[in-house]
Amino acid sequence: MFRKAWMLLNYKQKKNIIFIFALMFVAMILESLSIGIILPLISILLKGEIDTSFFSYFFVFGTLTGKNLVYIGLSVTLIIFLIKSLSLVFNLWQQTKFLRNLQFELTNRLFEYYLKSDYIFFLQNNSAHLYRNLTDLTSTFVSYIKASMVFLGEIIVFIGIAFVLFYVDFLGTTIILFSVGIVSFLIYVLTIEKISLLGEQRNIVGGELNKHLLQGMASAKDVKILDREADLIHQVDKNLFKHTRLIQIIQFITGLPRFSFEILMVCTFSALIFVMIDAKKEMIDIIQYLGIFAVASFRIVPGASRILNSFQNIKYIEPSVKLLIQEFDLKDNSYMKKNYLPKDSSIPIKFQKEINLKNLSFSYPIRKEFSLSKISMTIKKGDFIGIIGETGSGKSTLINLLIGLLKPSEGKVEV
Protein backbone atom coordinates (compact mmCIF):
# COMPACT_ATOMS: atom_id res chain seq x y z
CA MET A 1 0.00 0.00 0.00
CA PHE A 2 2.79 2.44 0.86
CA ARG A 3 4.37 1.82 -2.56
CA LYS A 4 1.13 2.86 -4.30
CA ALA A 5 0.75 5.85 -2.00
CA TRP A 6 4.35 6.80 -2.85
CA MET A 7 3.34 6.94 -6.55
CA LEU A 8 0.83 9.69 -5.77
CA LEU A 9 3.68 11.98 -4.74
CA ASN A 10 5.60 14.07 -7.25
CA TYR A 11 9.39 14.30 -7.42
CA LYS A 12 9.65 17.36 -5.17
CA GLN A 13 7.43 15.79 -2.49
CA LYS A 14 9.51 12.61 -2.50
CA LYS A 15 12.69 14.66 -2.05
CA ASN A 16 11.11 16.45 0.91
CA ILE A 17 10.23 13.15 2.59
CA ILE A 18 13.79 11.87 2.14
CA PHE A 19 15.10 15.12 3.66
CA ILE A 20 12.74 14.75 6.63
CA PHE A 21 13.95 11.18 7.21
CA ALA A 22 17.54 12.45 7.17
CA LEU A 23 16.53 14.89 9.92
CA MET A 24 14.96 11.98 11.82
CA PHE A 25 18.27 10.11 11.67
CA VAL A 26 20.04 13.16 13.14
CA ALA A 27 17.33 13.29 15.83
CA MET A 28 18.03 9.62 16.62
CA ILE A 29 21.72 10.39 17.23
CA LEU A 30 20.87 13.34 19.46
CA GLU A 31 18.22 11.35 21.36
CA SER A 32 20.77 8.60 21.98
CA LEU A 33 23.34 11.13 23.21
CA SER A 34 20.80 12.76 25.51
CA ILE A 35 20.09 9.37 27.10
CA GLY A 36 23.75 8.34 27.16
CA ILE A 37 24.89 11.51 28.96
CA ILE A 38 22.64 10.67 31.91
CA LEU A 39 24.83 7.81 33.16
CA PRO A 40 28.07 9.85 33.52
CA LEU A 41 26.04 12.75 34.94
CA ILE A 42 24.52 10.53 37.64
CA SER A 43 27.99 9.12 38.32
CA ILE A 44 29.35 12.66 38.77
CA LEU A 45 26.52 13.64 41.12
CA LEU A 46 26.67 10.45 43.23
CA LYS A 47 30.38 9.60 43.19
CA GLY A 48 32.10 12.80 42.12
CA GLU A 49 33.73 11.05 39.16
CA ILE A 50 32.98 9.47 35.80
CA ASP A 51 33.05 5.69 35.90
CA THR A 52 35.50 4.02 33.53
CA SER A 53 33.20 3.18 30.69
CA PHE A 54 32.47 3.81 27.06
CA PHE A 55 31.11 7.26 27.93
CA SER A 56 34.33 8.36 29.61
CA TYR A 57 36.03 8.52 26.20
CA PHE A 58 33.67 11.28 25.20
CA PHE A 59 33.71 13.20 28.47
CA VAL A 60 37.35 13.61 29.47
CA PHE A 61 37.74 16.46 31.94
CA GLY A 62 41.33 15.84 33.01
CA THR A 63 41.86 16.28 36.74
CA LEU A 64 38.60 18.12 37.36
CA THR A 65 36.91 17.12 40.59
CA GLY A 66 34.18 18.31 42.92
CA LYS A 67 32.08 21.30 41.91
CA ASN A 68 34.01 21.97 38.70
CA LEU A 69 33.28 18.46 37.44
CA VAL A 70 29.59 18.88 38.33
CA TYR A 71 29.42 22.24 36.53
CA ILE A 72 31.10 20.84 33.42
CA GLY A 73 28.88 17.75 33.44
CA LEU A 74 25.70 19.82 33.77
CA SER A 75 26.89 22.22 31.05
CA VAL A 76 27.57 19.40 28.58
CA THR A 77 24.17 17.87 29.38
CA LEU A 78 22.44 21.22 28.87
CA ILE A 79 24.19 21.78 25.53
CA ILE A 80 23.24 18.32 24.23
CA PHE A 81 19.58 18.75 25.25
CA LEU A 82 19.50 22.26 23.77
CA ILE A 83 20.89 21.09 20.42
CA LYS A 84 18.47 18.16 20.46
CA SER A 85 15.48 20.43 21.15
CA LEU A 86 16.44 22.88 18.39
CA SER A 87 16.88 19.99 15.97
CA LEU A 88 13.47 18.54 16.87
CA VAL A 89 11.81 21.97 16.51
CA PHE A 90 13.34 22.37 13.03
CA ASN A 91 12.25 18.84 12.11
CA LEU A 92 8.71 19.54 13.34
CA TRP A 93 8.54 22.73 11.25
CA GLN A 94 9.69 20.87 8.14
CA GLN A 95 7.12 18.12 8.70
CA THR A 96 4.18 20.48 9.26
CA LYS A 97 5.17 22.59 6.24
CA PHE A 98 5.45 19.50 4.04
CA LEU A 99 2.08 18.11 5.19
CA ARG A 100 0.37 21.48 4.62
CA ASN A 101 1.79 21.72 1.08
CA LEU A 102 0.84 18.11 0.40
CA GLN A 103 -2.76 18.77 1.45
CA PHE A 104 -2.93 21.86 -0.76
CA GLU A 105 -1.33 20.28 -3.84
CA LEU A 106 -3.21 16.98 -3.63
CA THR A 107 -6.62 18.64 -3.24
CA ASN A 108 -5.81 21.05 -6.06
CA ARG A 109 -4.70 18.23 -8.38
CA LEU A 110 -7.78 16.12 -7.65
CA PHE A 111 -10.13 19.08 -8.14
CA GLU A 112 -8.48 19.90 -11.48
CA TYR A 113 -8.67 16.23 -12.44
CA TYR A 114 -12.42 16.24 -11.76
CA LEU A 115 -13.09 19.59 -13.40
CA LYS A 116 -11.28 18.64 -16.63
CA SER A 117 -13.03 15.28 -16.88
CA ASP A 118 -15.77 14.75 -19.45
CA TYR A 119 -19.27 15.80 -18.46
CA ILE A 120 -20.41 12.19 -18.41
CA PHE A 121 -18.04 11.64 -15.48
CA PHE A 122 -20.27 13.89 -13.33
CA LEU A 123 -23.40 12.06 -14.49
CA GLN A 124 -21.90 8.74 -13.41
CA ASN A 125 -20.64 9.87 -10.00
CA ASN A 126 -22.48 11.06 -6.91
CA SER A 127 -21.51 14.65 -6.14
CA ALA A 128 -21.50 13.85 -2.41
CA HIS A 129 -18.84 11.19 -2.98
CA LEU A 130 -16.76 13.59 -5.10
CA TYR A 131 -17.02 16.20 -2.34
CA ARG A 132 -15.97 13.58 0.22
CA ASN A 133 -12.96 12.69 -1.93
CA LEU A 134 -11.87 16.33 -2.17
CA THR A 135 -12.21 17.03 1.53
CA ASP A 136 -12.06 13.81 3.51
CA LEU A 137 -9.92 11.48 1.38
CA THR A 138 -7.18 14.02 0.71
CA SER A 139 -6.93 14.91 4.41
CA THR A 140 -6.86 11.23 5.40
CA PHE A 141 -4.11 10.61 2.83
CA VAL A 142 -2.07 13.35 4.50
CA SER A 143 -2.79 11.66 7.84
CA TYR A 144 -1.60 8.38 6.32
CA ILE A 145 1.71 9.94 5.25
CA LYS A 146 2.06 11.59 8.67
CA ALA A 147 1.39 8.30 10.49
CA SER A 148 3.94 6.53 8.26
CA MET A 149 6.54 9.20 9.04
CA VAL A 150 5.86 8.93 12.78
CA PHE A 151 6.00 5.12 12.61
CA LEU A 152 9.38 4.99 10.85
CA GLY A 153 10.81 7.98 12.74
CA GLU A 154 9.97 6.53 16.15
CA ILE A 155 11.43 3.16 15.18
CA ILE A 156 14.70 4.88 14.20
CA VAL A 157 14.86 6.68 17.56
CA PHE A 158 13.84 3.51 19.41
CA ILE A 159 16.73 1.57 17.84
CA GLY A 160 19.23 4.30 18.76
CA ILE A 161 18.14 4.39 22.40
CA ALA A 162 18.14 0.58 22.53
CA PHE A 163 21.82 0.48 21.48
CA VAL A 164 22.72 2.86 24.32
CA LEU A 165 20.77 0.83 26.88
CA PHE A 166 22.24 -2.45 25.64
CA TYR A 167 25.70 -1.09 26.42
CA VAL A 168 24.64 0.05 29.89
CA ASP A 169 22.92 -3.19 30.89
CA PHE A 170 22.35 -5.91 28.30
CA LEU A 171 20.14 -8.11 30.49
CA GLY A 172 17.93 -5.32 31.81
CA THR A 173 17.47 -3.84 28.33
CA THR A 174 16.64 -7.26 26.89
CA ILE A 175 13.95 -7.77 29.55
CA ILE A 176 12.42 -4.33 28.90
CA LEU A 177 12.43 -4.64 25.09
CA PHE A 178 11.11 -8.20 25.22
CA SER A 179 8.24 -7.09 27.48
CA VAL A 180 7.44 -4.12 25.23
CA GLY A 181 7.51 -6.41 22.19
CA ILE A 182 5.14 -8.94 23.76
CA VAL A 183 2.63 -6.27 24.83
CA SER A 184 2.80 -4.58 21.40
CA PHE A 185 2.22 -7.90 19.63
CA LEU A 186 -0.79 -8.74 21.81
CA ILE A 187 -2.36 -5.31 21.25
CA TYR A 188 -1.73 -5.64 17.50
CA VAL A 189 -3.31 -9.10 17.27
CA LEU A 190 -6.34 -8.09 19.34
CA THR A 191 -7.09 -4.82 17.51
CA ILE A 192 -5.85 -5.01 13.89
CA GLU A 193 -8.93 -6.67 12.35
CA LYS A 194 -11.29 -4.38 14.25
CA ILE A 195 -9.38 -1.28 13.12
CA SER A 196 -9.40 -2.33 9.44
CA LEU A 197 -13.15 -2.98 9.64
CA LEU A 198 -13.74 0.42 11.26
CA GLY A 199 -11.81 2.08 8.42
CA GLU A 200 -14.02 0.46 5.77
CA GLN A 201 -17.20 1.36 7.67
CA ARG A 202 -15.97 4.94 8.00
CA ASN A 203 -15.80 5.36 4.21
CA ILE A 204 -19.34 4.01 3.73
CA VAL A 205 -20.92 6.00 6.56
CA GLY A 206 -19.00 9.16 5.63
CA GLY A 207 -20.23 8.96 2.03
CA GLU A 208 -23.86 8.53 3.13
CA LEU A 209 -23.57 11.37 5.63
CA ASN A 210 -22.18 13.77 3.01
CA LYS A 211 -24.89 12.73 0.55
CA HIS A 212 -27.74 13.53 2.94
CA LEU A 213 -26.12 16.78 4.12
CA LEU A 214 -25.71 17.99 0.54
CA GLN A 215 -29.26 16.95 -0.30
CA GLY A 216 -30.54 19.04 2.58
CA MET A 217 -28.57 22.13 1.56
CA ALA A 218 -28.70 21.92 -2.25
CA SER A 219 -32.29 20.68 -2.54
CA ALA A 220 -33.91 22.59 0.32
CA LYS A 221 -36.75 23.76 -1.96
CA ASP A 222 -37.69 20.22 -3.04
CA VAL A 223 -37.36 18.92 0.52
CA LYS A 224 -39.83 21.52 1.80
CA ILE A 225 -42.29 21.07 -1.08
CA LEU A 226 -42.32 17.29 -0.62
CA ASP A 227 -42.42 17.63 3.19
CA ARG A 228 -39.28 15.48 3.58
CA GLU A 229 -37.59 17.42 6.40
CA ALA A 230 -38.29 14.81 9.08
CA ASP A 231 -37.07 11.93 6.91
CA LEU A 232 -33.87 13.76 5.91
CA ILE A 233 -33.14 14.78 9.51
CA HIS A 234 -33.61 11.15 10.56
CA GLN A 235 -31.14 9.96 7.89
CA VAL A 236 -28.56 12.57 8.91
CA ASP A 237 -28.99 11.73 12.62
CA LYS A 238 -28.59 8.01 11.93
CA ASN A 239 -25.41 8.38 9.85
CA LEU A 240 -23.99 11.10 12.09
CA PHE A 241 -24.42 8.84 15.12
CA LYS A 242 -22.66 5.99 13.30
CA HIS A 243 -19.86 8.32 12.17
CA THR A 244 -19.18 9.76 15.63
CA ARG A 245 -19.48 6.28 17.17
CA LEU A 246 -16.75 5.00 14.83
CA ILE A 247 -14.51 7.92 15.80
CA GLN A 248 -15.12 7.23 19.50
CA ILE A 249 -14.19 3.55 19.15
CA ILE A 250 -10.99 4.20 17.19
CA GLN A 251 -9.90 6.91 19.64
CA PHE A 252 -10.52 4.51 22.53
CA ILE A 253 -8.55 1.69 20.88
CA THR A 254 -5.60 3.92 19.95
CA GLY A 255 -5.51 5.31 23.50
CA LEU A 256 -5.11 1.90 25.17
CA PRO A 257 -1.39 1.29 24.39
CA ARG A 258 -0.23 4.26 26.49
CA PHE A 259 -1.80 2.89 29.67
CA SER A 260 -0.59 -0.63 28.91
CA PHE A 261 3.02 0.53 28.47
CA GLU A 262 2.92 2.64 31.65
CA ILE A 263 1.81 -0.36 33.73
CA LEU A 264 4.42 -2.50 31.98
CA MET A 265 7.24 -0.06 32.82
CA VAL A 266 6.30 0.04 36.51
CA CYS A 267 6.24 -3.77 36.70
CA THR A 268 9.53 -4.07 34.79
CA PHE A 269 11.30 -1.51 36.99
CA SER A 270 10.10 -3.30 40.10
CA ALA A 271 11.41 -6.61 38.74
CA LEU A 272 14.80 -5.04 37.90
CA ILE A 273 15.13 -3.62 41.42
CA PHE A 274 14.42 -7.04 42.96
CA VAL A 275 16.97 -8.67 40.65
CA MET A 276 19.67 -6.09 41.50
CA ILE A 277 19.02 -6.34 45.23
CA ASP A 278 19.12 -10.13 45.02
CA ALA A 279 22.46 -9.85 43.17
CA LYS A 280 23.73 -7.80 46.16
CA LYS A 281 24.59 -4.73 44.11
CA GLU A 282 25.47 -1.50 45.85
CA MET A 283 22.56 0.90 46.32
CA ILE A 284 24.53 3.63 44.50
CA ASP A 285 24.91 1.35 41.46
CA ILE A 286 21.21 0.47 41.57
CA ILE A 287 20.26 4.16 41.64
CA GLN A 288 22.73 4.90 38.84
CA TYR A 289 21.35 2.24 36.49
CA LEU A 290 17.73 2.90 37.39
CA GLY A 291 18.34 6.60 36.72
CA ILE A 292 19.30 6.08 33.09
CA PHE A 293 16.51 3.52 32.59
CA ALA A 294 14.01 5.93 34.15
CA VAL A 295 15.08 8.75 31.83
CA ALA A 296 15.03 6.39 28.85
CA SER A 297 11.54 5.19 29.80
CA PHE A 298 10.23 8.75 29.48
CA ARG A 299 11.18 8.44 25.80
CA ILE A 300 10.61 4.72 25.25
CA VAL A 301 7.07 4.52 26.68
CA PRO A 302 5.55 7.36 24.61
CA GLY A 303 7.69 6.26 21.65
CA ALA A 304 6.40 2.68 21.78
CA SER A 305 2.87 4.02 22.19
CA ARG A 306 3.29 6.29 19.15
CA ILE A 307 4.71 3.43 17.07
CA LEU A 308 1.68 1.28 17.83
CA ASN A 309 -0.80 4.16 17.48
CA SER A 310 0.65 5.24 14.13
CA PHE A 311 0.48 1.66 12.85
CA GLN A 312 -3.14 1.41 14.01
CA ASN A 313 -3.90 4.71 12.24
CA ILE A 314 -2.23 3.44 9.07
CA LYS A 315 -4.49 0.36 9.03
CA TYR A 316 -7.54 2.49 9.85
CA ILE A 317 -6.82 4.97 7.05
CA GLU A 318 -5.79 2.40 4.39
CA PRO A 319 -9.33 1.90 2.97
CA SER A 320 -9.56 5.67 2.32
CA VAL A 321 -6.12 5.70 0.70
CA LYS A 322 -7.21 2.86 -1.60
CA LEU A 323 -10.21 4.92 -2.71
CA LEU A 324 -8.01 7.95 -3.41
CA ILE A 325 -5.59 5.84 -5.45
CA GLN A 326 -8.54 4.57 -7.49
CA GLU A 327 -9.60 8.15 -8.12
CA PHE A 328 -6.24 8.92 -9.69
CA ASP A 329 -6.44 5.66 -11.64
CA LEU A 330 -2.90 4.46 -11.07
CA LYS A 331 -3.42 1.47 -13.34
CA ASP A 332 -3.17 3.60 -16.45
CA ASN A 333 -1.09 6.32 -14.68
CA SER A 334 -1.48 8.74 -17.62
CA TYR A 335 -2.59 11.60 -15.41
CA MET A 336 0.11 10.98 -12.84
CA LYS A 337 2.84 11.07 -15.48
CA LYS A 338 1.66 14.39 -16.89
CA ASN A 339 0.41 15.84 -13.58
CA TYR A 340 -1.99 18.00 -15.55
CA LEU A 341 -4.45 17.24 -18.29
CA PRO A 342 -3.69 18.84 -21.67
CA LYS A 343 -5.72 21.87 -22.57
CA ASP A 344 -8.18 21.61 -25.41
CA SER A 345 -6.45 23.08 -28.45
CA SER A 346 -9.42 22.83 -30.84
CA ILE A 347 -10.32 25.87 -32.95
CA PRO A 348 -13.55 27.64 -31.85
CA ILE A 349 -16.51 26.78 -34.08
CA LYS A 350 -18.47 29.62 -35.73
CA PHE A 351 -22.18 28.98 -36.26
CA GLN A 352 -22.94 30.58 -39.66
CA LYS A 353 -25.60 28.55 -41.51
CA GLU A 354 -26.97 25.39 -39.93
CA ILE A 355 -26.38 22.45 -37.58
CA ASN A 356 -26.73 18.96 -39.08
CA LEU A 357 -27.31 15.84 -36.99
CA LYS A 358 -26.46 12.73 -39.01
CA ASN A 359 -27.50 9.30 -37.67
CA LEU A 360 -26.83 10.50 -34.14
CA SER A 361 -26.91 7.77 -31.49
CA PHE A 362 -25.88 7.82 -27.86
CA SER A 363 -25.78 5.33 -24.99
CA TYR A 364 -24.52 5.84 -21.46
CA PRO A 365 -21.63 3.56 -20.41
CA ILE A 366 -23.68 1.87 -17.69
CA ARG A 367 -26.54 1.05 -20.10
CA LYS A 368 -26.66 -1.29 -23.08
CA GLU A 369 -29.63 0.31 -24.85
CA PHE A 370 -29.38 3.62 -26.71
CA SER A 371 -30.91 6.73 -25.15
CA LEU A 372 -30.98 8.23 -28.66
CA SER A 373 -30.88 6.16 -31.84
CA LYS A 374 -30.28 7.25 -35.46
CA ILE A 375 -31.39 10.87 -35.00
CA SER A 376 -31.05 13.02 -38.13
CA MET A 377 -32.21 16.62 -38.34
CA THR A 378 -31.15 20.09 -39.52
CA ILE A 379 -31.36 23.28 -37.46
CA LYS A 380 -30.88 26.50 -39.44
CA LYS A 381 -29.44 29.65 -37.96
CA GLY A 382 -32.22 31.89 -36.62
CA ASP A 383 -34.78 29.06 -36.29
CA PHE A 384 -36.74 28.59 -33.07
CA ILE A 385 -37.42 24.94 -32.27
CA GLY A 386 -39.04 23.04 -29.44
CA ILE A 387 -38.17 19.54 -28.26
CA ILE A 388 -40.97 17.62 -26.56
CA GLY A 389 -41.23 14.10 -25.22
CA GLU A 390 -41.84 11.95 -22.18
CA THR A 391 -39.53 11.91 -19.18
CA GLY A 392 -36.46 9.86 -19.99
CA SER A 393 -36.97 10.06 -23.76
CA GLY A 394 -33.59 11.78 -24.27
CA LYS A 395 -34.40 15.50 -24.47
CA SER A 396 -31.63 16.58 -22.08
CA THR A 397 -29.24 14.11 -23.67
CA LEU A 398 -29.87 15.64 -27.11
CA ILE A 399 -29.24 19.16 -25.77
CA ASN A 400 -26.02 18.01 -24.10
CA LEU A 401 -24.90 16.47 -27.41
CA LEU A 402 -25.70 19.68 -29.31
CA ILE A 403 -23.69 21.90 -26.97
CA GLY A 404 -20.78 19.45 -26.83
CA LEU A 405 -21.01 18.24 -23.23
CA LEU A 406 -21.49 14.67 -24.45
CA LYS A 407 -19.87 12.89 -27.38
CA PRO A 408 -22.00 10.73 -29.74
CA SER A 409 -21.64 6.96 -29.60
CA GLU A 410 -22.43 6.87 -33.33
CA GLY A 411 -23.02 9.51 -35.99
CA LYS A 412 -21.87 13.11 -35.86
CA VAL A 413 -22.88 16.73 -35.39
CA GLU A 414 -21.80 19.09 -38.18
CA VAL A 415 -21.84 22.90 -37.94
Segments from the language model and where they lie:
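Transmembrane helix-loop-helix hairpins at lipid-water interfaces of multipass membrane proteins
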Residues: F21-I83, F166-F178, I277-I287
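Transmembrane helices of ABC transporter permease
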Residues: L23-V26, V150-Q201, A271-I286
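Short intracellular "coupling" helices and adjacent cytoplasmic loop segments at the cytosolic face
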Residues: E49, R100, N108-T138, H212-Q235, ...
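Hydrophobic alpha-helical segments in the permease module
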Residues: T77-K84, G181-I182, R258-F261, M265, ...
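Juxtamembrane loop-to-helix connectors within ABC transporter transmembrane domains
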Residues: Q95, L115-G160, A218, K242-T244, ...
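Cytosolic ends of transmembrane helices, especially the final helix of ABC transmembrane type-1 domains
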Residues: V205, K221-R228, F252-G255, F259, ...
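Primarily ABC-family ATPase nucleotide-binding module
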Residues: F328-G386, E414
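Helix-to-loop junction immediately C-terminal to a conserved catalytic motif
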Residues: I403
